[in-house]
């Protein structure tokens, strides 16, 4: 077997006939598959055991040799080798063709490679291949040249002879007519009509003679003419002409029909000469001919550089794939189901055998040609059914699946079996909430856990002597004996499992948890993990996967634990936020009410306050004063205040003051609920003495995530969750429909606006308003009415009611929903997305009328339809993004570049003060500085050095110092040859530390952009015909448009030169006339610079004014600019920044946070190539797309040797095009256009370096990222006690030192190699062997390289 790690490159090329015979184990001669009586494969058939190997392990076909001891013997009776039956998945056969056939990929693909090579149009090529035309394959030029004078004489004499015969025949006929006339005269019958009839007949005969001879002369003339000019590659459609030419001059040339002709032509090609001729043609040809020559040169060059033989595109032998890859299965009714490939192979074999027989019989050429054409068609449909003509169909008119179809599309080999495999040791079940679970735990149903951990349990049962051997241990497990469950508990402890919820839109869709055994059949999920998985408990299912090896377990525990994945990689915010019930509980606790029991009481300690609460002396929401120890961290900017005492006793003050005592303790005013809330936060975190709703809680959690270790954050979140769940029922929040009160003024307001609407309609009836103006006025009216009613609802809404608590805390719902229940629904849109000017005046509390209900349906239905479409569209976008960026991996620490991007950190607010830019967390945050930052106050002090990271604190400090812009390192300016470097990327947003080498930042970027894709709108916004000329594309279509580098709809022009603007309006629209400056470099006509006119619509708002002087690249009107124009006019960097900003704008407008660096990674991939304009002294071809790094390297070497470097211009490619243009043919073929990619790769004999992720997944190697990198793969890690104590489950609990064994010491840790959890070298799967368990295998050996 092939060792999967024994190679680091894969090459694809053209197989010659000898290669195919070399792979084969025998020729398939018969179309038969299996014998229907014996059900055994037929000899020499498509399933023949002699060729492909035995159907049963270690047994020949006739049964003479059975058992493994005869291994390798070939049976002399039946000719079958005694070996394993699985060789039937590997061994190939072949079919020797009676006539050559062309490979349809090379002839029918677009462009036709065969056509380019032979310089023949695809149409002509098809006529030759399918026996409609003859092709000249070779001409003996020298002999023809030498013999031409003699042949000319022969030709002349033949023409002369024919002319003489023509003249003599005509003369004879004339003489005959004279004789006939004379005879008539003698007979006395020479009347007018008789003479005329005789003459006419004679003239007809003479004309026929003349025509016959002239045709012969013309044919001879045509044959000789054709022969004189004959050259290889010429085609002749006229069969008679060809035969005549063959008869006369057959010694001087050769030619034929079909693939045979193509093969002979390919064998006689002189590629070196063709290459030289084409290079000459490129230098001084017209643009059209130059383009064609370039395309031809590309194909010719491919053959020259690789040493591939062109004639390999024509096949003499066809490989037959192994029978177990095209199986035949018996169904219940005795019938057979077979793979389509078998039918296609049978057609080929039948036609091939018939052709052989016809050749042996010496059949006429026309029959042979017909049979050869049918053979060609059979091979075509085997390779790519339906590519030419009508596809071959099977039963029920379904086109048969050919070899190409096996590779193509979602169900093809690449995407179905190589990139998406089924996984062993996995299960799936419905999820339910596990409120008592810690963040790192999940509940695993006992039956599922037992099945997943079965081998581990069996081994442990044998180790503990509960069973003598594996068989009895397995019986114990199947019976479910009591001891099994104890062993299962032991086996699963500290063995993490992976949970996954589909669709896995980002990397948080798979996380590791420690399993806890639970009853029932549902998986229990901790509520804090829901947001990351986007899971809820309405019937969602999740899959469980079991990491088996020690390395896999270590990776799951150290990198994938849910308690470590608290931050979202897209924006760096916390993803594990308490929600719903938890928020309600925390909001209730942190609320302080005026005038409740115990307000103003003073307590000497927390314990005293707790006692008072237990005795119902104080309310949890009462403001009390508690003396707190000096370790207590006060809120920022705290000043002592005072609290009014609710029921002061005699002699007590009515007001109590907060104060700080000399011993450092503080008398602090707060509620007991807030004390409880703050106890969940880290001890040194400033006291939060305010009401905590969802937004505030989010800020607190984000802040804690920034300041503390992951373990502390996880502990805090768990404590918040427990407190929220425990206290939510205490709040007693419940609500009924009656809690929603309609404002009494509602009906009056609606009536008032109805009157106004009637007035608008009356004006329309009188012709004072147009239809459009009426519509717009009504829409404005009812929008205003809805807002007024909503305002009334909010004003009359009781802020202490249960419903208000639910909404204000952010637990569920919002004011908009309350308005629809108590106020009015307002205006709704129709399916086109246009607003219907008739509003829904009712609310849900009163119920809708029939018409209102009907027009409301549009929105609901459109919402569902849109969601379905968006999901598909967003998924496809994510797939393309992943594909284009999958090989962007952090390859090195520092590329050493001095370049960077200027990024704004501050802006002016309305008062003119410098404040941090709005999207700071999505722009400058987490980047490294590309240059020192100097204090603008003195121009000398270095505030921060190059390579310092921009945290939020640093950014705020920069703003405080008056710094407005800094130069940051960026992926766009990174100079790593492959991938990016850590310093140009900056911090990983998932950890807030510098990104590790090996991090797959490309995939993370694609997931970050794709995951919120479903939240983006799908429609183009219609602005009511006022603001913009056309619908401005927004949402998901706009993102797609940008990433595919398409020219936007309603494109806004930008100026190519600096100059002055003049705006002219006329009937046809508006013209903006630019008069370029004299020094702008604009082209001149007769020494004068010609003005440039831009035609724009009158309805589009202008961005320039008449008489303005503008810079190069100024946008003239509102709208989207074509990034390709920006690239041409302003250069690569401006185009890159434009795409990043535009994509960011779309996401921000939908309220989605995403960091610019993710978009930059994608844009970096879109602009990483150069189009060659002039090849200089390099081997590059004009028009070729070359990687930036390779382009620079080639030029560097050329210049070093004194040559002329190539000239190129930056290219901007859409993500689909960029994915297909990748260096890895495996990656491109598994993306789209599989057959085209493979055709091109085979011709160029491309080598895949296996540097990306997809390529390695396809061939089953570890991916070259993360722990798959050699630097990590070879590391041996053993945790010590200190490390184990800091892991979150044991965090702050004294670790796991107390194992109940008094003699336990740290030294014993070295013996804990968990060998009982491992299988050593045993790999579970098909070859699971019980014998391997009898001796203890010990731990896995370390991987060595």
UniProtKB/Swiss-Prot annotation:
Its EC number is 2.7.7.6. It catalyses: RNA(n) + a ribonucleoside 5'-triphosphate = RNA(n+1) + diphosphate. One of its GO terms (molecular function) is magnesium ion binding. Binds 1 Mg(2+) ion per subunit. One of its GO terms (cellular component) is DNA-directed RNA polymerase complex. Zn(2+) 2 binds at residues 895, 974, 981, 984. Pfam families: RNA_pol_Rpb1_1, RNA_pol_Rpb1_2, RNA_pol_Rpb1_3, RNA_pol_Rpb1_4, RNA_pol_Rpb1_5. DNA-dependent RNA polymerase catalyzes the transcription of DNA into RNA using the four ribonucleoside triphosphates as substrates. The RNAP catalytic core consists of 2 alpha, 1 beta, 1 beta' and 1 omega subunit. When a sigma factor is associated with the core the holoenzyme is formed, which can initiate transcription. Belongs to the RNA polymerase beta' chain family. NCBIfam families: PRK14906.1, rpoC_TIGR. This is DNA-directed RNA polymerase subunit beta'.
